[in-house]
Amino acid sequence: MLAMEMRSLGASGMQVSRLCFGTLTMGPMQRGFSPERGAALLTYAYARGFRFLDTADIYDTYPHIRLALQKCAYRVSTKAYCWDKATASAALERAFFGLDREYVDVFMLHEQESIHTLRGHREALDYLNEQKAKGRIGLVGVSTHYAGCVRAAAVFGGVDVIHPLINVEGIGIQDGTRADMEAAIAYAHSLGVGIFAMKPLG
């Protein structure tokens, strides 16, 4: 079994592998791997040092991950489109049911855009932080394609982790350039917010 460098997600102290395994492509939205095939791929990656994986409510890869977790001690990050207590609670329970566990390491609001969407989703964020206080969630965060949202989330309160889109060409950044996103990420990181990159290959 190979080792990979481990790093802390910001000031949280949560240790994760330097690379995070994104599971979107194995699910029905893209390659359509069976849960068994997806779990085999995750097990292969685990043997090569991966200890952190990312999914989402919409990806429909909980079955793949659930099987992999029978053999592998991954930290799991998931995210969902939720805007109030009811939708956040339902999404969290779907994650627990799908993963066959009563805890998730990271739970994020999916595809936040700005300070305005953060304000509009405050009830959901507050609920997730309540669940964090109860020990059901490790860290709370947001995913985004917007540099402005990275900056806003860093000081919004209740955000431990940000999952921003960043790659060499700046492909997919919605409100600026790669340099703008890099500056926003550096700002958030300087405040102790955990950062893990999305779509680093474009």
Annotated model-derived regions:
Residues 96-116:
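Active-site groove signature of glycoside hydrolases
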Residues 10-15, 65-73, 93-102, 153-157, ...:
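Acidic (Asp/Glu)-rich catalytic clusters
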Residues 9, 21, 53, 76, ...:
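Conserved, mostly hydrophobic/aromatic
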Residues 6, 61, 112-202:
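Beta/alpha (TIM)-barrel catalytic core signal, keyed to glycine-rich beta->alpha loops juxtaposed to Asp/Glu
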Residues 1-74:
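N-terminal binding-site loop/beta-alpha segment at the start of enzyme catalytic domains
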Residues 50, 101-104, 137, 159:
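A structural motif
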Residues 74-86, 107-112:
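A short, structured active-site edge motif that brings together acidic residues
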Residues 32-45, 85-100, 144-153:
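Short, acidic/polar
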